[in-house]
C-alpha cells in the first residue's frame, strides 16, 4: 500500500506539476512564446510591485518610481513577501511581458482563484475583473476565469490585486497561457474529474443511506456522514467554476469538512474492525474539534484582519491548501 501511494504521488508530481511542466518560463518578467501552439504555465519570474495598484499606463510612465522584484507564483502566502513583521493583506501588481510570434493569433489565459479581487489588463486594456481591488471601494469575488485576446509581437499582462480577508493573498495558483481550445480543455478536464468524483460519492452516499435504513447498522450511517463531508470538501472546484464567491464562509467550510473527513474515517474504521478501544473515538473528537476551531478562527481572523491568526491558520491548513 505504501509503495502504491508513493507511486501515485510521484505520478502526480511528474505529470500534474505546473512548476515542472514542459515549456519555457519567463526570465526577468519576459516570456518568449514560440509559434507551436504549446501550453505555458506562468509560474516564475513575474515582475511584482508590492503595496501598490498600478495600471499599465502608470507602469509605463512611472516605473522607476516604484520598487519591484521578481517572484514565483505561490512563493509567498501573502502580500508581505515573507516578512512576518508586515501584514499579509494589502495590494500588489503582477506584470509579465510576452514576446509572441509575428503572425497574429488568439490566446487565452486561465486564472484560478486569485485572492480576493483583481483587474486584468492585456496590452494596456482592461480585459476583465473580479470584485473591486480599489482599497477604498473593496469588494471581494473569487472565481475561476478564462480571458481571451489576440496578439502578435509584444504583449503585456498586468494583474492588479487586493486582498483583505483570506488566509493566502494574491495569486497563489499558476496561470496558464495557450490557445483558447487548450486552455478550455485543461479547465474542462479538471472540472470533469471533479464532477465524476462528486457523482460517484453521491451515489455511494445514497447506497449508504439505503443500507442504513435496511440494516440499522451504525457503520453505514457513519459512512453516509463521511460521504457528506467528502461532498462538502470536494464541491469547491465545481462551485468556483460557475459562481463568484466571497472568502468566508466558503473557505472556512472547506477547512471544516476537511477535518471532519478524518474524524469520519477513524469512526468508520473502528466500527468495521470492531475494536473496543476508545482511542479512535478520542482522535475523531480531536479532529472534529480542530475543524470547528479552524472554521471559527478563519471567520474571526478574516473579519478582524489578524495577520498573526491567519499565519497560524495557514500553518495548520498547509497540507490542505497544497493538496
Where are these regions (language model features)?
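Intrinsic-disorder/low-complexity, polar/charged segments enriched in Ser/Thr/Lys/Arg/Asp/Glu/Gln
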Residues: 91-97, 106-108, 144-146, 154-156
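An acidic-aromatic loop/edge-strand motif
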Residues: 139-195
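Extended carbohydrate-recognition surfaces in non-catalytic/accessory domains of CAZymes
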Residues: 1-102
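Juxtamembrane segments at transmembrane-helix boundaries
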Residues: 195-323
Amino acid at each position: 500500500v505504501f509503495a502504491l501511494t508513493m507511486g501515485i504521488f510521484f505520478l502526480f508530481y511528474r505529470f500534474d506539476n505546473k512548476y515542472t511542466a514542459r515549456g519555457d518560463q519567463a526570465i526577468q518578467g519576459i516570456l518568449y512564446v514560440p509559434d507551436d501552439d504549446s501550453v505555458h504555465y506562468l509560474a516564475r519570474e513575474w515582475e511584482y510591485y508590492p503595496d501598490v495598484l498600478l495600471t499599465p499606463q502608470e507602469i509605463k510612465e512611472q516605473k522607476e518610481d516604484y520598487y519591484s522584484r521578481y517572484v514565483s507564483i505561490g512563493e509567498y502566502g501573502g502580500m508581505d513577501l515573507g516578512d512576518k513583521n508586515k501584514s499579509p493583506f494589502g495590494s500588489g501588481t503582477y506584470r509579465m511581458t510576452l514576446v509572441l510570434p509575428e503572425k497574429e493569433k488568439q490566446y487565452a489565459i486561465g486564472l484560478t482563484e486569485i485572492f480576493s479581487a483583481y483587474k486584468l489588463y492585456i496590452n494596456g486594456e482592461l480585459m476583465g475583473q473580479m470584485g473591486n481591488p480599489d482599497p477604498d471601494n473593496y469588494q471581494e469575488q473569487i472565481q475561476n476565469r478564462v480571458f481571451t485576446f489576440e496578439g502578435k509581437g509584444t504583449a503585456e499582462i498586468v494583474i492588479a490585486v487586493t486582498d483583505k480577508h483570506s488566509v493566502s493573498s494574491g495569486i497563489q495558483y499558476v496561470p496558464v497561457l495557450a490557445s483558447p481550445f487548450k486552455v478550455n480543455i485543461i479547465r474542462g478536464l479538471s472540472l470533469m474529474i471533479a464532477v465524476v468524483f462528486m457523482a460517484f460519492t453521491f451515489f455511494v452516499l445514497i447506497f449508504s443511506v439505503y443500507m442504513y435504513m435496511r440494516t440499522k447498522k451504525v457503520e453505514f450511517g457513519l459512512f453516509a456522514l463521511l460521504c457528506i463531508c467528502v461532498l462538502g470538501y470536494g464541491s469547491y472546484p465545481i462551485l468556483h467554476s460557475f459562481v463568484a464567491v466571497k472568502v468566508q464562509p466558503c473557505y472556512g467550510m472547506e477547512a471544516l469538512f476537511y477535518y471532519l473527513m478524518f474524524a469520519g474515517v477513524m469512526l468508520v474504521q473502528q466500527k468495521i474492525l470492531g475494536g473496543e478501544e476508545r482511542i479512535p473515538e478520542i482522535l475523531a473528537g480531536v479532529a472534529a474539534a480542530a475543524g470547528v476551531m479552524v472554521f471559527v478562527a478563519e471567520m474571526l481572523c478574516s473579519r478582524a484582519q489578524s495577520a498573526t491568526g491567519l499565519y497560524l491558520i495557514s500553518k495548520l491548513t498547509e497540507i490542505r491548501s497544497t493538496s
